[in-house]
Amino acid sequence: ELYPNLYRDETAVRLIDQIDYDFSVAEKNSRSLMQRFGALEVAMRQCDLAWEVRDYLKTHPCAAVVNLGCGLDNTGRACDNGSCKIYNLDFPDVIALRQQLLPAGEREQNIPCDLKDPA
């Protein structure tokens, strides 16, 4: 919400209202210069990543978008071109929460796994 002209994540805005969590401490901390700089850095990185994914999908429309350690990030869906497949991978408890809040779409899979497990 600090830099909506740079990157506006409507899903995150919706989830903040949906999740039973007191964000007041985070909001208070967001006033510091370091926190604002960190938020700017994250917004810029997210904007760049989304641009790269969309650009790649222009020339590879049926590609797979793989989001490792996805949490509640919705970049794959935000960049969806209508043809790609989206794979969101994270720990089982994270994927369980994701399934509740962001159920997988038609060409999307939420995959529970431990990315540190070499098996």
Residue ranges and their predicted role:
Residues E1-V66, C70-C113, P118:
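Rossmann-like AdoMet
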